[in-house]
Structure formats: C-alpha cells, structure tokens
Amino acid sequence: QIELPVWTPATTEAFATYGEIDQGAIAQPVKMPPGVFPQFGGLEITTSSTQLQALTDAVVYLYNYPFDCNEQIASRVISIAALRDVLSAFKSKDLPSPAAIEASMKADFEKLKRRQHYSGGWGFWQEQPWPFLTIHVAHALARAKEKGYKPDEQMIQRALRYLRSIESHIPPWYGEEARPAIIAYSIYVRNRLKDPDPAKAKRLIAEAGGVDK
C-alpha cells in the first residue's frame, strides 16, 4: 500500500511599488486578493531606498540557480560581470561575498571550458553546438574579461574561431530574419573581444538594404 499526499495548489506572488518621497509620508493600501488560501503563505513587506534591490534579487537568484546548462552559466556570468560593481557599492547583505563570487566565476569558466566543442562552440550541455548559444557564451566571457576576470584564453580563441565562420554554423532551416541577426550578434561580440571585422559588418548592412531601410 502506498500513500500519496494531495497538496493544495498554492503559489506566491510578489508586487513592487516605486516612487519618491521628498518630504512627509505616504500611505500604501494593501488588500487581500480574492481566491487566496488563507492557510498558506502570508504577507511580507520590505522597503528599500533604491530600485537596485530588484537587481540584487535577480543576481542572487542566478547565483544560486541549481541547473547549470551552458546558457544558464553564461547568463550568470554576464549578470555578475555587469552588476558586480554597482551592487557591491550598496553593500547589500543578500549578495555573496567577493571571495564567493570570484570562486563561482572560476568554477563557471572551468565548466564552460570542459564543455566546449572541438569546433569552438557550445551546446546547451555537451551536444552539438548551437550558433546563438555559442555567441551568448562568448559574450559572457567578453564581459567577464572586461571586468578583470580571467577566463581561459585558449577557450576564448577557440570561440573566436567559431564566430569568424559563424555563417557555416547556421543551419539552413533557420528563418530569413534569424540568420542576419545571429551574424550581427557575432560581429558585436567579436568586437568586444578585440577582434573587429568592419568589412563583414558593412557587407551585412548592405545585404540588409542599408541602415535607413
């Protein structure tokens, strides 16, 4: 005999209100929404002097995200590289310590290095590479490098080799709009990695009918 519990389907919702109070005070009405299960959850109210609190929550969420496919790792690397300095200036108690962030970045670089395909690209895990995903990972490495982190240089060079020939990696069944968008993204990331290709950029613009089209 097996007993299986049947739980009440319940979830939580979060709402945010932003504004400025130069002087005086403000009253914020709170009303219980209809259809709630009063035996679950509760009401939690937090305040912050800056809208950066929402960014802190997002970075912490990505930092602790348990499912590490290459797309998710790259997204975490980008968020930490882009927001580390700003969020650290506010000394949020919810942020990991600088040493923990540094260790996390190093671990993510190692995972990406191990999972890189011999062609220089990345799949979601260790399967055949996907062109857009490869550019996304390379973009993350570029952002991290700009912030002083040290991803493996050979990994970056292999990724650049893939990006330089991105056209050959785009499947023929991709849509007409997807192909030039992917090529444009690859040119942008190559430029951030100090590998500019203005000639390819000009050709892409010309093929699209010019910048005023």
Which role does the model predict for each range below?
Residues 1-177, 183-206:
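Extended, solvent-exposed functional surface patches
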Residues 206-213:
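Non-catalytic carbohydrate-binding regions of carbohydrate-active enzymes
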